[in-house]
């Protein structure tokens, strides 16, 4: 049964808003004092590089982008295609990554090797990093471990949307073997002989703690270099 609502006028306490204002100021002051005197950063890499705190604080300020906080080993960064030792991509253009992608940001065109008509390769492999939701489904669905998100780099800034369209040439930058936490190196693979697997494990390098332009987490993979490259392409397109 419908009933009529009665809108009563606010009383003096509600109309002045003073209690809520005081409560908000108290919350801000509490967190301010807590962060100023008693906070502890749980990241040991950050604590090791602290600049010296005020009171008992271990808060630090990193001079970004020259200094960057380290990413966790499980961080999902920019995509990269894993090359074989001969430089060809591991990808066999099975379309599993493009099919499972919820954002539909992967586009593949398949082609056949002239000397091996059984196996295919991606004649075109494009990822729109702006549409990507960084879910990692493409990495899990790939049967050949051909695509990874272990670059340790986030999407570089750019002035043009076209600079975030990554093709197979840019995606193939990076070493064929990843880092020591690579699950393929830990569990092995039927397609890799045991002696070859041990050699790959011996060559794997530890995941770096801090990414800089001088020591990037992936050789030849620099955020500043990619941003400069995108800017040069945009300037060339305007001419």
Curated annotation (Swiss-Prot):
* UniProt binding sites for [4Fe-4S] cluster 1: 91, 94, 97, 142
Domain (4Fe-4S ferredoxin-type) spans: 81-111, 123-152
Tell me if Transcription regulation is a UniProt keyword of this record: no
Uppermost EC category? translocase
Entry cofactors: [4Fe-4S] cluster
- Report the subcellular localization: Cell inner membrane
Binding locations of [4Fe-4S] cluster 2 = 101, 132, 135, 138
Recorded hits in SUPFAM superfamilies, A to Z, give: 4Fe-4S ferredoxins
Translocase found in the keyword field:
yes
Described purpose of this protein according to its UniProt entry: NDH-1 shuttles electrons from NADH, via FMN and iron-sulfur (Fe-S) centers, to quinones in the respiratory chain. The immediate electron acceptor for the enzyme in this species is believed to be ubiquinone. Couples the redox reaction to proton translocation (for every two electrons transferred, four hydrogen ions are translocated across the cytoplasmic membrane), and thus conserves the redox energy in a proton gradient.
Any single GO molecular-function term of the entry would be: 4 iron, 4 sulfur cluster binding
**Subunit details for this protein?**
NDH-1 is composed of 14 different subunits. Subunits NuoA, H, J, K, L, M, N constitute the membrane sector of the complex.
Q: Name one GO cellular component term.
A: plasma membrane
Looking up InterPro entries in the UniProt record yields:
4Fe4S_Fe-S-bd (IPR017896), 4Fe4S_Fe_S_CS (IPR017900), NADH_quinone_OxRdtase_chainI (IPR010226)
Cofactor, free-text remark: Binds 2 [4Fe-4S] clusters per subunit.
Native source species:
Anaeromyxobacter dehalogenans (strain 2CP-C)
Q: Which Pfam families match?
A: Fer4
Q: Which reaction does it catalyse?
A: a quinone + NADH + 5 H(+)(in) = a quinol + NAD(+) + 4 H(+)(out)
Q: What is its EC number?
A: 7.1.1.-
Q: What topology does the record note for this protein and the membrane?
A: Peripheral membrane protein
Q: What is the protein name for this chain?
A: NADH-quinone oxidoreductase subunit I 1
Keyword annotations? 4Fe-4S, Cell inner membrane, Cell membrane, Iron, Iron-sulfur, Membrane, Metal-binding, NAD, Quinone, Repeat, Translocase, Ubiquinone
Spell out the family assignment given in the record's similarity comment: Belongs to the complex I 23 kDa subunit family.
PROSITE patterns tied to this protein: 4FE4S_FER_1 (PS00198), 4FE4S_FER_2 (PS51379)
């Amino acid at each position: 049964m419908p009933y009529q609502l009665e809108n009563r006028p606010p009383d003096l306490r509600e109309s002045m808003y003073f209690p809520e204002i005081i409560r908000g100021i108290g919350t801000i002051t509490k967190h301010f004092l807590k962060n100023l005197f008693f906070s502890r950063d749980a990241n040991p890499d950050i604590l090791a590089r602290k600049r010296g705190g005020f009171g008992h604080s271990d808060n630090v300020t990193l001079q970004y982008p020259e200094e960057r906080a380290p990413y966790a080993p499980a961080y999902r960064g920019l995509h990269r295609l894993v090359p074989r030792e001969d430089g060809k991509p591991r990808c066999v253009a099975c379309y599993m990554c493009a099919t499972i992608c919820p954002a539909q940001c992967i586009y593949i065109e398949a082609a056949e090797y002239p000397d091996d008509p059984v196996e295919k390769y991606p004649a075109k492999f494009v990822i729109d990093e702006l549409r990507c939701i960084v879910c990692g489904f493409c990495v899990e669905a790939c049967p050949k471990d051909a695509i990874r998100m272990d670059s340790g780099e986030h999407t570089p800034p750019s002035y043009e949307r076209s600079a975030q369209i990554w093709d197979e040439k840019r995606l193939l930058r990076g070493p064929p073997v990843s880092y020591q936490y690579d699950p393929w190196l830990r569990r092995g693979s039927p397609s890799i002989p045991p002696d070859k697997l041990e050699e790959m494990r011996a060559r794997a390098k530890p995941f770096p703690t801090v990414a800089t332009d001088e020591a990037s987490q992936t050789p030849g993979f620099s955020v500043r270099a990619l941003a400069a490259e995108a800017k040069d392409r945009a300037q060339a397109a305007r001419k």
